[in-house]
Amino acid sequence: MAKEKFVKTKPHVNIGTIGHVDHGKTTLTAAITAVLAEKGYAEKRDYDQIDNAPEERERGITIATSHVEYETDKRHYAHVDCPGHADYVKNMITGAAQMDGAILVVSAADGPMPQTREHILLARQVGVPYIVVFLNKEDMVDDPELLELVEMEVRELLNEYDFPGDDVPVIAGSALKALEEAKEGKLGEWSEKILKLMEAVDEYIPTPERDIDKPFLMPIEDVFSISGRGTVVTGRIERGVVKVGDEIEIVGLRPTQKTTVTGVEMFRKELDQGEAGDNVGVLLRGTKKEEVERGQVLAQPGTITPHTKFEAEIYVLTKEEGGRHTPFFSGYRPQFYVRTTDVTGTITLPEGVEMVMPGDNVKINAELIAPIALEEGTRFAIREGGRTVGAGVVSKIIE
């Protein structure tokens, strides 16, 4: 009997596997699909299919990522897994794969390793809100006290980076053993542990708020003046809904102004409202063409504010990716391309960091020469004369 097609009626959640190299992230991804396939909830994907991830380009950066889909009783999941550590760094910073939560894989035989720490830090910096832990290779640990010790270490590490380490679900198991069971078509004790992990993911990682339910935000791409009607700004609505009659704010580059939406149109047709994902023209009451420009945003009043100083996590492109050939130092002044425009800014490196090499990722402080609508989680590119040399995400607003 053919397995039924995915029905998109269940709530959708994006997750991914993170953790140290060789702790079993890809094996776990394969095991989840294999075990759920036995229940008719997934198409089985072999380790090799997942590990030979196709390369994608996101803002000119080459990232190898595997995407798998599966379901549980409650939800539909899109799951990302990356073959190499550098791919994780790029993925998380560019937001190429937005994660609503992550499964942190830690080998019970080895305990937390350097990349375990680095991935937790990245998750904190780029705003991955929830982590569930899978202690893998449980079959290789004979002493139950050792398992408890590793669990304590992982919980302490999560606490260190402001995750609720004491409340995070920790499930022990063996991805390889579960995979072997599923291959033989019989789900035993190891497969049960995978199902238990997915139950924890179902329960602990909340369903994210949909873009359309968030407060309205639209980056301005273009401004036109239509005689007899006023000023129209165009752009793609990033989130929320805009209706005729709504009061909105124009934020960034200049003092914030309030205005009222007198029309919304798409493909030259009048609409009552535009929503997240729509490319629209928005007619603004009493706003002159000179008063608005590309790089500003339209937003629900009070939901986003202009800033010049922030902390960010950035990835610097390699020479092969078309980036710089040389390092840069504190005081470096590139352009920050935020949504639709470039703004010059100065980068200050953390104490003890002398310089940043192409291929590095680093936490920086930035100060822009003009205020831009920013919030934690805003993504940007770093450019020099129109060429992308880095990518980043705002981790904290300073002023």
Curated annotation (Swiss-Prot):
E.C. number(s) listed in UniProt: 3.6.5.3
Record-listed GTP binding positions: 19-26, 81-85, 136-139
All copies of domain tr-type G, residue ranges: 10-209
Recorded GO MF terms: GTP binding; GTPase activity; translation elongation factor activity
Catalytic activity annotation: GTP + H2O = GDP + phosphate + H(+)
Cellular component per GO, a single term: cytosol
Alphabetical list of InterPro entries matching this protein: EF-Tu_GTP-bd, EF-Tu_GTPase, EFTu-like_2, EFTU_2, G_TR_CS, P-loop_NTPase, Small_GTP-bd, T_Tr_GTP-bd_dom
Pfam families named in the record: GTP_EFTU, GTP_EFTU_D2, GTP_EFTU_D3
Binding site for Mg(2+): T26
CDD domains, sorted: EF_Tu (cd01884), EFTU_II (cd03697), EFTU_III (cd03707)
Region ranges (G3): 81-84
UniProt region (G1), positions on chain: 19-26
Keyword set includes Acetylation: no
Subcellular localization(s) per the UniProt record: Cytoplasm
Annotated region (G4), positions in chain: 136-139
Keyword Cell cycle applies: no
Residue numbers spanned by region G5: 174-176
Description of how the protein assembles with itself and partners: Monomer.
HAMAP family attached to this UniProt entry: EF_Tu_B (MF_00118_B)
Task of the protein: GTP hydrolase that promotes the GTP-dependent binding of aminoacyl-tRNA to the A-site of ribosomes during protein biosynthesis.
Stated family: Belongs to the TRAFAC class translation factor GTPase superfamily. Classic translation factor GTPase family. EF-Tu/EF-1A subfamily.
Protein name: Elongation factor Tu
Organism: Nitratiruptor sp. (strain SB155-2)
Recorded name of the encoding gene: tuf
